[in-house]
């Protein structure tokens, strides 16, 4: 369970990071 959650998190992280950097600008 934790492994699958980590893989999903690593996939979502880049998208969230891009969204956050876009909000700053």
Swiss-Prot record:
Q: Name one GO biological process term.
A: defense response to bacterium
Provide the family line.
Answer: Belongs to the non-disulfide-bridged peptide (NDBP) superfamily. Medium-length antimicrobial peptide (group 3) family.
GO cellular component terms given for this protein: extracellular region; membrane; other organism cell membrane
- Name of protein: Peptide TtAP-1
Q: Which domain of life does the protein's organism represent?
A: Eukaryota
**Glutamine amide occurs at which residues?**
25
Protein function: Antimicrobial peptide with potent activity against a range of clinically relevant Gram-positive and Gram-negative aerobes and against the anaerobe Clostridioides difficile (P.aeruginosa (DSM 50071); MIC=12.5 ug/mL, E.coli (DSM 787); MIC=6.25 ug/mL, K.pneumoniae (ATCC BAA 1705); MIC=6.25 ug/mL, A.baumannii (DSM 30008); MIC=6.25 ug/mL, S.aureus (ATCC 43300); MIC=6.25 ug/mL, S.epidermidis (DSM 28319); MIC=6.25 ug/mL, E.faecalis (MF 06036); MIC=6.25 ug/mL, E.faecium (NCTC 12201); MIC=6.25 ug/mL, C.difficile (DSM 27147); MIC=3.13 ug/mL, C.difficile (ATCC BAA 1382); MIC=3.13 ug/mL).
Where this protein primarily resides, as one coarse class? secreted
Species this chain originates from: Tityus trinitatis (Trinidad thick-tailed scorpion)
Summarize tissue expression. Expressed by the venom gland.
User: Keywords assigned by UniProt?
Assistant: Amidation, Antibiotic, Antimicrobial, Cytolysis, Hemolysis, Membrane, Secreted, Target cell membrane, Target membrane
Location(s) in or outside the cell: Secreted; Target cell membrane
């Amino acid at each position: 369970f934790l492994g699958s959650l980590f893989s999903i998190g690593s996939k979502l992280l880049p998208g969230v990071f891009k969204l956050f950097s876009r909000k700053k600008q």
